[in-house]
Amino acid sequence: DQKLLDTASEVIKRNFDNPDFDMNMLASELNMGRSKMFLRLKEVMGLTPNEFTMKLKLEEALRLLQEEPQYNISEISYRLGFTSPRYFSRCFKSFYGVAPLSYRKDSPREDSQAEEDIQE
């Protein structure tokens, strides 16, 4: 079960920036039929493969918003394979309850970035 999760996570993360990545590709990478993959992942994780993919993308978005201030919302959305920044923002807000830009403004920033802001 852990090997399945690890492999699925690795495949999904490797394809973050691929807007054409879909569940058929994931099933192929996992050497499973699509139906079996859906059943196994739902059984192991309690999430559908689509939900798991979205969860991983949004967790990475959270990290990028916190740790990579050089990327704007559009860049983050495209890096993670979203078809538009608007769709990314809607998904992020639905998952975390706050828009990505608001999250970035309200999240604690690293000391070095805060010091740079003070010096400007």
Give a label for each model feature.
Residues 43-83, 105-120:
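Terminal helix-turn-helix DNA-binding modules in bacterial transcription factors
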Residues 8-9, 27, 61, 99, ...:
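A sequence-composition feature that detects small, non-aromatic residues
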Residues 9-21, 41, 45, 62-72, ...:
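Basic, amphipathic alpha-helical hairpins
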Residues 23-52, 56, 77-99:
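Basic/polar phosphate-binding segments, predominantly the helix-turn-helix DNA-binding elements
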Residues 1-31, 36, 40-43, 118-119:
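Membrane-proximal linker segments that couple transmembrane helices to downstream signaling/catalytic modules
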